[in-house]
Every structure is written in C-alpha cells, then in structure tokens.
C-alpha cells in the first residue's frame, strides 16, 4: 500500500502543549464533528474546531462556551494549533485521513474512531487512543483514558515520518519501475507502453 504523503518538513513539533483539544475538519455531517462537540459539551474541556462547511452554524448553536470555532484557517494557523493542542480529535471514519498524520508530525497524539484509515496511521496506546463506537460515551471514555496515560511526542513524530514525502516518492518510483520492468497491467488496466 502506498499512502498519500504528508509534509513532515512543514509539520514539526515546536513549543509547549496547552490544555486544549483540536478538531480540524470540513464541517459536514459524515465527518462527525457534532460527536466531538457533544462529547466536549459534556466533559467541559476546551475544544478548538477549525474548518468550514454546511454544519458550522448548527455546530455553533449546540456548542457550550468551552468550544471555540475558528472557521477555515491558513496552514500556518493550523500548524500552530497542531503544535499546541494536547491531542487531536478525529471522530469520523476515513479511507486514510491526512490530518491525524499531520498532528502526529507535530508531536501531537490522536484520539480517533478506531475504524478505517486511522487504524493504519495511529498506534493505540502509543501515538494515540481509539474509541470503539461513534457515541459520546465512547469518545468521552477515550479522552479519559488518554488523560491517564503518557504518550511520547517523539514517538508520534517518528510514526508520522513513515508517511513523509520522501518515502512516498521512493515507493512510487519503485512501483513504477517494477511495473515497467514486468510490463504489469494492474487494476485500471493501464497500458504501461503508453503511460
């Protein structure tokens, strides 16, 4: 499997962690940001939400004062929050999910729904914590478990480097060379001769 690359030279650890959690996403229903908002409404911890989308007004309407919405932000602001948040919240199910890897590249652990791509990018108990169901209770339990363990930001960073640009380029080059040498036609029936 060749994973999409993450710019680990841009997303780097820096500064001190603060008592905030971060959720970065397009604010659309399937991303499940409402789950994070409802869970953090109940536990009262500070949650910063970055992103825009059709659910922004709805999410603001249900959020308590401990939840702050910043809307869409440039990469510099995103990186700043990745660096200073205590953990990154990833409540949706994605095929891959770049944001958990960007967070880890900044030395930040991830609290993620334990399905889909997160299971390939986050190491439960090592670089983050999984929750088993997309329910408030399950996410609250994961935050509680996270608060009771110590996660090494250096290990998060090392894990993210497995998804860096250099590795991606190396894997793609090897794959293309292999296909050319073996004149292999794969899933999409690409004509290697005319590729």
Annotated model-derived regions:
Residues 2, 6, 10-50:
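Conserved donor-binding/catalytic core segment of Leloir-type glycosyltransferases
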Residues 57-79:
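Nucleotide-activated donor-binding/catalytic signature segment of Leloir-type glycosyltransferases, i.e.
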Residues 79, 101-105, 119-120, 126:
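Short alpha-helical segment that forms part of, or immediately flanks, the ligand-binding pocket
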Residues 80-85, 172:
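Short alpha-helical donor nucleotide-sugar binding micro-motif in glycosyltransferases
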Residues 83-95, 108:
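Acidic donor-binding loop of glycosyltransferase active sites
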Residues 89, 109-113, 122:
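Short hydrophobic beta-strand element within catalytic cores of glycosyltransferases
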Residues 134, 150-195:
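A charged, aromatic-enriched C-terminal amphipathic alpha-helix characteristic of glycosyltransferases
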């Amino acid at each position: 499997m060749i994973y999409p690359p993450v710019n680990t030279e841009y997303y780097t650890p820096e500064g001190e962690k603060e008592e905030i959690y971060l959720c970065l996403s397009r604010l659309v229903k399937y991303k499940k940001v409402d789950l994070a908002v409802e869970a953090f409404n109940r536990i009262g911890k500070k949650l910063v939400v970055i992103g825009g989308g059709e659910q922004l007004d709805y999410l603001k309407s249900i959020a308590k004062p401990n939840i702050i919405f910043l809307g869409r932000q440039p990469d510099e602001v995103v990186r700043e929050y990745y660096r200073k948040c205590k953990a990154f919240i990833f409540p949706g199910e994605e095929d891959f999910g770049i944001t958990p890897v960007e967070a880890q590249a900044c030395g930040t652990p991830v609290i993620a729904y334990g399905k889909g791509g997160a299971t390939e990018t986050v190491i439960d108990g090592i670089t983050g914590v999984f929750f088993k169901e997309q329910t408030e209770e399950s996410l609250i339990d994961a935050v509680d478990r996270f608060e009771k363990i110590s996660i090494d930001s250096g290990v998060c960073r090392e894990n993210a480097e497995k998804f860096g640009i250099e590795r991606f380029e190396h894997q793609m080059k090897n794959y293309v060379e292999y296909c050319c040498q073996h004149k292999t036609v794969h899933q999409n029936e690409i004509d290697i001769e005319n590729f």
